[in-house]
């Protein structure tokens, strides 16, 4: 954390030293601090507790003011562990909210909630910082034009398109390809849109954060040789962190993304994994601050906290922040206040299916469960809308026929249904695609498929022009032309074997 956001280095100005306080109460991660009369810090100001613990080790704990209690006392939430703190320790009011480094120097690095690098690669080479608390862009700054954010991933662009500057919920269990999909999106936005990405790890497992970092280095999303050419900045506040850090790490990641949008005028992808943990941390802090719990024990300020984060994620006339948020649904209950509050903000949902992953169809995006508010003829055009609807109808009918096929076999179906099943199986395989970031695992070069090419490919399958081609020709290819070329190769190979 840059204690004084107006200077290039850490430190506390002489003015700030004139406003010292004292710790008077410690309740876990929540501290009560007394200040001299008339020198109370503002809400959201960063405080720093300084001193030594019982074995003489220096203590430097940053906190954020949450409440003014009266009697010259404030209540603050710690951003790191409060082990070793005692009453009477000196506290310094920094006079400003937590500020974090922003700009190109953050790419390829890992930060904590305070904007301090935690990757052992030395200090961040930037003097530019920004406070994590800001208001959402004004109405006059917003870009109200509805436009699609092309990802180059066929199943997403055709059936559940992302809105530029929108919010997408990513639903999927362990091992269905969530991380690989996230890395491919980071790669594609950098190549196709010249954009960058910010990844906020909110309250998830430290092991997963480490795995993601290693996989990003392996796939080239983070450039090991030249860190400055990396495509993503990582901000972690994992499960072992105090609730204050988990509650604010999403804002730290968002602040870094806002700089790329507002100053660099870029399109930015912001990943939040997991948005439920943001709510959960807020719930823990709320109870510690003495607020009366609301429905299901959640904080009474749930909607306000969610809104203050989500409303800053938007398109302006300068650039856009498109956010992809992993959503954990507690006990699979979609009516739980945490996911229910999140759904109100989402423009699209991408659901990953274990059944498709088991078939080896990657990305394992469920074409029938995934939805988007953008899939309307007035937004995407009649051709795109009609093609998407026909693809969904074909897949839905195939799903209905699967029980009959399992019991009686394909031969018992009518001629029309057999033809429909053959096309549905081709569509299902054509929805798969080789990824750039998975080249090291699959050996197949990655493919970016434009929207027009995607629509043309599915129209050809639906029209029946490609009924004579084998279904394996459509598996893990980019465009429809590659599928026809693959079919010719398969035919030549089978002829040679004869």
From Swiss-Prot:
GO terms for biological process: proton motive force-driven mitochondrial ATP synthesis. Its main location: plastid. Keywords: ATP synthesis, ATP-binding, CF(1), Chloroplast, Hydrogen ion transport, Ion transport, Membrane, Nucleotide-binding, Plastid, Thylakoid, Translocase, Transport. GO terms for molecular function: ATP binding; ATP hydrolysis activity; proton-transporting ATP synthase activity, rotational mechanism. Its EC number is 7.1.2.2. GO terms for cellular component: chloroplast thylakoid membrane; mitochondrion; proton-transporting ATP synthase complex. InterPro entries: AAA+_ATPase (IPR003593), ATP-synt_VA_C (IPR055190), ATP_synth_F1_bsu (IPR005722), ATPase_a/bsu_AS (IPR020003), ATPase_alpha/beta_chains (IPR050053), ATPase_F1/V1/A1_a/bsu_N (IPR004100), ATPase_F1/V1/A1_a/bsu_N_sf (IPR036121), ATPase_F1/V1/A1_a/bsu_nucl-bd (IPR000194). It is found in: Plastid, Chloroplast thylakoid membrane. It catalyses: ATP + H2O + 4 H(+)(in) = ADP + phosphate + 5 H(+)(out). ATP binds at residues 172-179. It comes from the Eukaryota. It is a peripheral membrane protein. Belongs to the ATPase alpha/beta chains family. Produces ATP from ADP in the presence of a proton gradient across the membrane. The catalytic sites are hosted primarily by the beta subunits. F-type ATPases have 2 components, CF(1) - the catalytic core - and CF(0) - the membrane proton channel. CF(1) has five subunits: alpha(3), beta(3), gamma(1), delta(1), epsilon(1). CF(0) has four main subunits: a(1), b(1), b'(1) and c(9-12). This is ATP synthase subunit beta, chloroplastic.
């Amino acid at each position: 954390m840059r204690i004084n956001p107006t200077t290039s280095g850490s430190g506390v100005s002489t003015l700030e030293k004139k406003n010292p306080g004292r710790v008077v109460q410690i309740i876990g991660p929540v501290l009560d601090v007394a200040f001299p009369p008339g020198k109370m810090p503002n809400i959201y100001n960063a405080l720093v507790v300084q001193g030594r613990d019982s074995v003489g080790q220096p203590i430097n704990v940053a906190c954020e003011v949450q409440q003014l209690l009266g009697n010259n006392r404030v209540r603050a939430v710690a951003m790191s562990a409060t082990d070793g703190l005692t009453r009477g320790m000196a506290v310094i009011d920094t006079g400003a909210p937590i500020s974090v480094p922003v700009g190109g120097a953050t790419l390829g690095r890992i930060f904590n909630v305070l904007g301090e690098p935690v990757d052992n690669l030395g200090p961040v080479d930037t003097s530019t910082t920004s406070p994590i608390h800001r208001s959402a862009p004004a109405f006059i700054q917003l870009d109200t034009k509805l436009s699609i954010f092309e990802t180059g991933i066929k199943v997403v662009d055709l059936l559940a398109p992302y809105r530029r500057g929108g919010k997408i919920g990513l639903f999927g269990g362990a091992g269905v390809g969530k991380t690989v999909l996230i890395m491919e999106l980071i790669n594609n936005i950098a190549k196709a849109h010249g954009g960058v990405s910010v990844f906020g790890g909110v309250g998830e497992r430290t092991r997963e954060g480490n795995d993601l970092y290693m996989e990003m280095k392996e796939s080239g999303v983070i450039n090991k040789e030249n860190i400055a050419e990396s495509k993503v900045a990582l901000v972690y506040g994992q499960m072992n962190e105090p609730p204050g850090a988990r509650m604010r790490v999403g804002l730290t990641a968002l602040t870094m993304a806002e700089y790329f949008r507002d100053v660099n005028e870029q399109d930015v992808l912001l990943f939040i994994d997991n948005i439920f943990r943001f709510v959960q941390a807020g719930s823990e802090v709320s109870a510690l601050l003495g607020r009366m719990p609301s429905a299901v024990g959640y904080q009474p300020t749930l909607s306000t906290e969610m809104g203050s984060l989500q409303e800053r994620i938007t398109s302006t006339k300068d650039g856009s922040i498109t956010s992809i948020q992993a959503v954990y649904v507690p006990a699979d209950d979609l009516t739980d206040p945490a996911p229910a509050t999140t759904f109100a903000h989402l423009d699209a949902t991408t659901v990953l299916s274990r059944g498709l992953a088991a078939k080896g169809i990657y990305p394992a995006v469920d074409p029938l469960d995934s939805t988007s508010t953008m899939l309307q003829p007035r937004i995407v055009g009649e051709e795109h809308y009609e093609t998407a609807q026909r693809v969904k109808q074909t897949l839905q009918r195939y799903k209905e026929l699967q029980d009959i096929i399992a019991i009686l076999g394909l031969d018992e179906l009518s001629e029309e249904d057999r033809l429909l099943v053959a096309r549905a199986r081709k569509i299902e395989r054509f929805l798969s695609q080789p990824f750039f970031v998975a080249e090291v695992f699959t050996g197949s070069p990655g493919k970016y498929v434009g929207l027009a090419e995607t629509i043309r490919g599915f129209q050809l399958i639906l029209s029946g022009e490609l009924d004579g081609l084998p279904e394996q020709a459509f598996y893990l290819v980019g465009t429809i032309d590659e599928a026809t070329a693959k079919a010719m190769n398969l035919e030549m190979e089978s002829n040679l074997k004869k």
